[in-house]
A protein has these predicted regions:
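C-terminal motif of bacterial Sec signal peptides marking the signal peptidase cleavage site
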Residues: 7-10
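Extracytosolic ligand-binding ectodomains
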Residues: 12-426
Length: 426
């Protein structure tokens, strides 16, 4: 699993440059009184000799562990590279599992907020988990920065209206799926010249939100959405749903879902009357080796974040994608299996910079102002990360928002990740 390393090393830079800032390790005996915050959300006091507490909340077991494990490892690498904050070490404790579900997100968030020493969270992996975790984290005065949540409902409609699941203190380095939906719609309508398409979701906030974003954008371009329906994540027989879709005679089907359901859709669609030759399209949930190497995935188009990071450098640590991937493989024996590893690394350094800006040493202890942590992130502009330049809007969208579409060759996973056939940037 070395494809992501090839992408980072071989592809061109977007010409983002590092501002050269780095994390110094000030002595714990120094006094710092120019930190951000007004105390309105409380202050965390870290006693001398103790660690600053943050948490990783990601899907680290089950079918979506391929997404959460690289996220957690990205956080761990960022902590190691960043170093101490004002002489205090930072720890994630034991990684928590969001189970890629609302129940999992809620249970883990309850554990987090019960510990008043926790300052912030990197997670969740899945948008569905965030819908339940975010309100609890917000109410506790903490922050949560997600590397891979993409549902528009968690932030905004990009036109000034908060999403139904937006809560203050929530941020993300991942893109907003309104951009990904627009990218795939533009690709299908303008590049493939297909004017009739259908979409399938599984009811999850991520899959349904992205399918809807695609459908809306496709219709705005002049296309016709011939079908919009859902499957259950546990379904293995997709023929009834595909037969329903076939009735509309679409030229393409976009199914931004996960494995194993995505495996069955790709496998069974060509055998359904009326769908022979239909173009199959997926998204970042299927942009993984275990799916892309399946015979039924051959020739498919898959959208996701633009991984062509080139020489982009994280301004806090000086780390590039090439360096990150070399360290990741050395530490773990394999390359990341999912495309949000750099988003996780950048999310972690943002949190660490926010804590640094909102804290000072007093009588040998570190005082961290919770409101100051949010203040730093709310005003973030022009931060240079591995993924590019990050700036946070009023609803927590901080990511680079660049999307690519790749065409899959099931016999060449590494080459497929690099096989960009369409690029989109707002």
């Amino acid at each position: 699993m070395f494809a992501f390393a090839l992408v980072a090393a071989a592809c061109g830079s977007d010409d983002d440059s590092s501002s050269g800032s780095s994390s110094d390790s000030s002595s714990a005996t120094e006094e710092h009184h120019d930190s951000l915050g007004d105390g309105s959300l409380g202050v965390v006091t870290v006693e001398a000799g103790e660690d600053i507490q943050i948490r990783s909340l990601n899907a680290i077991t089950g079918d979506v562990a391929f997404l959460g494990i690289p996220n957690q490892r990205g956080v761990e690498q960022a902590l190691a590279d960043f170093g101490d904050i004002h002489g205090f070490s930072v720890t994630i404790g034991t990684g928590l599992d969001d189970l890629c579900s609302a129940d999992g997100g809620q249970a883990a968030a309850q554990t987090i907020v019960a510990d008043e020493q926790v300052v912030g969270v990197i997670g969740t992996s899945c948008s569905g988990a965030a819908t339940a975790a975010s309100p609890l984290i917000s109410e506790a005065g903490m922050v949560m920065i997600s590397p891979s949540n993409t549902s528009p409902a968690l932030t905004s409609d990009l036109a000034g209206t908060a999403g139904e699941n937006y809560h203050p203190g929530y941020y993300r380095t991942a893109h907003n799926d309104l951009f990904q939906g627009a990218a795939m719609a533009k690709f299908v309508y303008e590049e493939l010249e297909i004017s009739e398409a259908a979409a399938i979701h599984d009811g999850d906030p991520y899959t349904q939100g992205l399918a809807q974003a695609f459908a809306d954008a496709f219709e705005n371009l002049g296309g016709t959405v011939t079908g919009f329906t859902g499957v259950n994540k546990e379904d293995t027989d997709m023929v009834p749903v595909l037969t329903e879709i076939a009735a509309g005679s679409p030229g393409a089907i976009f199914f931004p879902i996960f494995q194993p359901a995505g495996d069955f859709v790709a496998d069974q669609a060509p055998g359904v009357s009326g769908l022979d030759g239909v173009v199959l399209l997926g998204a970042d949930g299927l942009q993984v080796q275990t799916f892309m190497e399946l015979p039924q995935a051959d020739g498919m188009y898959l959208s996701g974040p633009d991984l062509r990071y080139g020489t982009n450098t994280n301004q806090s640590t000086g780390v590039t994608a090439e360096k990150f991937l070399a360290d990741y493989e050395a530490n773990n024996g394999n390359a990341p299996e999912a495309p949000f590893w750099a988003h996780s690394y950048d999310a972690a350094t943002l949190l660490l910079e926010a804590i640094k800006a909102a804290s000072h040493v007093h009588d040998g202890n570190l005082e961290i102002d919770r409101a100051g942590v949010r203040e730093y992130l709310d005003n973030l502009s022009g931060y240079e990360g591995i993924i590019g330049t990050l700036s946070c809007d009023d609803f927590g969208d901080c990511g680079a928002q660049r999307i690519t579409v790749v065409q899959n060759d099931s016999a060449d996973f590494a080459g497929s990740i690099e096989n960009v056939v369409f690029s989109f940037a707002p």
